[in-house]
């Protein structure tokens, strides 16, 4: 069985090889979201923002506004809690087409403690205009969503 994360990165890398407008943005989470191969093979299409989720969302919005197809990736807890204002204003209200890949929602990062738990991500994001939330159950659904 193929994990959803592997399906995501395999599909994204395959598409990005053919489309230079596809950009992956992350926040010191290339290992968590399995973007190491993407970063090595397509460094010109990869942006590492460090531990700066607000900046990653803002950069992603700017890239999308310029016509790029942006996937911003990292732990779900940080894109909902730490950068909520940027997601609301820079993505939702501004209608910038950025895909947020939030990994390890809920308490999946149990060992890292409450700072890494994301119990409210779906509840909060569904209130924003134009925000679509999907939770693929397997590699096949993940691949279709990325495509």
Outline where the language-model segments fall.
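Thiamine diphosphate
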Residues: 1-147
């Amino acid at each position: 069985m193929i994990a959803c994360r592997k399906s995501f990165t395999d599909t994204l890398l395959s598409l990005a090889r053919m489309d230079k407008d596809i950009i992956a943005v992350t926040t010191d989470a290339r290992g968590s979201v399995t973007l190491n191969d993407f970063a090595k093979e397509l460094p010109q299409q990869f942006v590492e923002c460090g531990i700066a989720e607000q900046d990653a969302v803002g950069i992603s919005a700017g890239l999308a506004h310029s016509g790029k197809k942006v996937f911003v990736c990292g732990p779900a807890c940080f894109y909902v809690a730490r950068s909520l204002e940027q997601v609301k204003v820079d993505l939702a209200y501004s209608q910038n087409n950025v895909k947020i890949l939030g990994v390890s929602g809920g308490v999946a990062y149990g060992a890292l403690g409450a700072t890494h738990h994301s119990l409210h991500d779906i509840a909060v994001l569904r209130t924003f205009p134009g925000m679509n939330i999907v939770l693929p159950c397997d590699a096949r659904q993940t691949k279709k969503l990325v495509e």
